[in-house]
């Protein structure tokens, strides 16, 4: 992320990534909108959200495909956004920035794996029908979610630890005050896994991420250094 090109890539990513992430979570939140309250209540009673998500795909494959695709695009765009944030933080807190970004990147890689399993499950609905596809997915849901040698599920933990480290680093470096550090940390606690439901609170976490990253992206693009928050106990 060095030089003029790196600054532009990083700045655009800081602005665009949380917006696309928000759009993906919002669309995923809407995939159950056409079901009756009784149907939604039945989905909620299941141990996992997968049956509801597969039923949503069977009912409206275009919407569900768009929702999951935009969500994946947001996850991919977050990689350069987090890299730019880590680069800024590294000037004053290099260890926290480096480890925070590395762990967050592992979490994003895990999301790509989960997206692949999501796609395979939707393909099963197309080929076998909803009932048989749901049975096959639920019979092996835990193994599908954990992945080979449990590498994906282990990597997904990086999101939580990495978000905490980078938030602390951003606060100590003065890049974020306590307000934006907490706003950044909150979406880093978002669910991980296969065929997960986006609840309203999930959408709100994306708004929090935008409030944390978009102003920083604007400053990066305009060539202004982030305001030093002086690591005060209460600051933006």
Stretches with model-predicted labels:
Residues 1-236:
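Hydrophobic, aromatic-enriched alpha-helical segments typical of multi-pass transmembrane helices
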């Amino acid at each position: 992320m060095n030089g003029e090109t790196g600054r532009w890539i990083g700045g655009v990513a800081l602005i665009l990534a949380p917006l696309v992430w928000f759009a993906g979570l919002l669309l995923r939140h809407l995939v159950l909108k056409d079901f009756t309250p009784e149907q939604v209540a039945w989905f909620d009673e299941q141990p996992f959200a997968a049956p509801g998500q597969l039923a949503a795909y069977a009912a409206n494959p275009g919407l569900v495909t768009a929702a999951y695709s935009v969500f994946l695009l947001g996850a991919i765009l977050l990689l350069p956004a987090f890299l730019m944030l880590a680069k800024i933080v590294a000037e004053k807190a290099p260890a926290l920035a480096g480890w925070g970004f590395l762990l967050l990147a592992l979490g994003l890689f895990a999301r790509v794996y989960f997206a692949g399993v999501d796609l395979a499950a939707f393909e099963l609905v197309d080929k076998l029908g909803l009932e048989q596809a749901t049975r096959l997915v639920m019979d092996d849901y835990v193994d599908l979610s954990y992945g080979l040698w449990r590498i994906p599920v282990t990597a997904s933990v990086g999101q939580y630890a990495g978000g905490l480290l980078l938030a602390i680093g951003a606060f100590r470096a003065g890049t974020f005050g306590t307000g934006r550090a907490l706003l950044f940390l909150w979406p880093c606690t978002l669910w991980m896994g296969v065929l997960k439901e986006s609840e309203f609170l999930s959408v709100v976490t994306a708004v929090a991420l935008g409030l944390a990253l978009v102003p920083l992206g604007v400053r990066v693009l305009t060539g202004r250094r982030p305001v030093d928050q002086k690591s005060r106990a209460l600051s933006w």
